[in-house]
Amino acid sequence: MVKHFAVIGDPIAHSLSPLMHNAGYKALNLAADYQKFQVSPEDLQEAVFGLKALGFSGWNVTVPHKETILPFLDELTEEAVRAGAVNTVKVDKGRLIGHNTDGSGFVRSLQEHMELDECKQIVILGAGGAAKGIAMALAPFGAQLCLMNRTPERGAELVEKILEGGGQARQEPWGRGEWLAQADCVIQTTSIGLKKEEYPFSLAGIRPGTLVVDIIFNPWETPFLHSAKAMGCKTVNGIDMLLYQGVNAWEFWLEDKAPVESMRKALYQALAV
């Protein structure tokens, strides 16, 4: 019996998730497929119950539905509760289980480049949905999280949530260079750079060798990463975050190890890198 999976969002045409998951199914000769569906906000409830009625085993959820889908689910995992958002749904004996693999996917990708237990200070630029998932997943590792956001109120809300969960966090003014100089890792989570625009403040003072991450992966190297590389930093884009959130979703659905390298190869080929 073929298992059906999908991703829903608006827009969705750009999604690389079907390529990644279908390559994984092919690598393991699994009877499964993965599709993408454009679902507008007003059609979300109908789509959720439609996928369930059609016998889908699970689906991913992307912008703008990660929070608005919550009322239509029967249960949330601890990761989903902590993030306050869902990017993965599993149908289990007729119940819809909401899960979040964004944060764990980011952590898994970051661990390929640094020992998180040895990291003392991490600067996170932005305080939107992506920053929230990343910050809540990083907090248990014990690093001091320094948030910088253009809208201080939103940053303050995220700091409070981290502190309530037992993590260490504070907010600093957007673009304060001295905090960049103290960071072991800097994570750029905003949309700045999608159109190849320059970052609105300088990275002057950042230490050579600092790990600098931009969760954007197209363009492959944003102006932000280009500047960091020019200053001697180790740079990483968001492609492996996409990979590992997909890998973690796969393992949540199928309760088995995903073929990581086959899924990675499909992503890299799609982006011609």
From Swiss-Prot:
Keywords from the UniProt entry? Amino-acid biosynthesis, Aromatic amino acid biosynthesis, NADP, Oxidoreductase
Question: What pathway does the annotation place this protein in?
Answer: Metabolic intermediate biosynthesis; chorismate biosynthesis; chorismate from D-erythrose 4-phosphate and phosphoenolpyruvate: step 4/7
Q: Provide the coiled-coil residue spans.
A: none
- Where does this protein hold shikimate? S15, L16, S17, T62, N87, D102
Which Gene Ontology cellular component terms are annotated? cytosol
Enzyme Commission code(s) on record: 1.1.1.25
**Which Pfam families does its entry note?**
SDH_C, Shikimate_DH, Shikimate_dh_N
Binding-site positions, NADP(+): E78, G126, A127, G128, G129, A130, N149, R150, T151, P152, E153, R154, I215, G238
> What residue stretch is flagged as signal peptide?
none
Matching SUPFAM superfamilies, A to Z? Aminoacid dehydrogenase-like, N-terminal domain, NAD(P)-binding Rossmann-fold domains
What molecular function terms (GO) are annotated for this protein? NADP binding; shikimate 3-dehydrogenase (NADP+) activity
Matches recorded under InterPro entries: Aminoacid_DH-like_N_sf, NAD(P)-bd_dom_sf, SDH_C, Shikimate_DH, Shikimate_DH-bd_N, Shikimate_DH_fam, Shikm_DH/Glu-tRNA_Rdtase
Q: Which domain of life is it from?
A: Bacteria
Q: Does the keyword Transmembrane apply?
A: no
Catalytic reactions of this protein: shikimate + NADP(+) = 3-dehydroshikimate + NADPH + H(+)
User: Which GO biological process categories is it annotated with?
Assistant: amino acid biosynthetic process; aromatic amino acid family biosynthetic process; chorismate biosynthetic process; shikimate metabolic process
Q: Does the keyword Transferase apply?
A: no
Active site, per annotation: K66
Function of the protein: Involved in the biosynthesis of the chorismate, which leads to the biosynthesis of aromatic amino acids. Catalyzes the reversible NADPH linked reduction of 3-dehydroshikimate (DHSA) to yield shikimate (SA).
The UniProt entry's sequence similarity note says: Belongs to the shikimate dehydrogenase family.
Q: How does it assemble?
A: Homodimer.
The protein depicted here goes by the name Shikimate dehydrogenase (NADP(+))
